């Protein structure tokens, strides 16, 4: 794969890198950076691709991304993905509860 993908949009570059990646050779942040795509841009594009239904999975150790190659790979990732979402929702609830508790203390 060419280092610099000239004439392509950032999304096209991310799609190309993901298409050539797998669990043993994921698309890494270094690959994105070699193609002038920042970490935040890569994450945003990957989020948009996921929202569009593309099965972009990530390694446990945050080494990189690739397209799920089978149902088991996708299910394994989605289990972790959903667990993270549940943890974030619980944390958000605690933050909200803490805020209102502190507001009540101020008003008392």
Predicted regions and their residues:
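A short, conserved structural fragment
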Residues: 50-60
């Amino acid at each position: 794969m060419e280092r610099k993908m000239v004439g392509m949009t950032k999304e096209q570059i991310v799609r190309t890198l993901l298409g050539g990646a797998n669990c043993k050779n994921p698309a890494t942040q270094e690959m994105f950076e070699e193609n002038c795509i920042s970490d935040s841009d890569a994450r945003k594009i990957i989020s948009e691709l996921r929202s569009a239904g593309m099965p972009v999975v990530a390694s446990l150790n945050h080494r990189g991304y690739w397209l799920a190659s089978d149902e088991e790979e996708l299910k394994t990732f989605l289990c972790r993905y959903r667990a993270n979402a549940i943890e974030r929702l619980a944390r958000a609830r605690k933050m909200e509860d803490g805020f209102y508790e502190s507001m009540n203390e101020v008003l008392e």
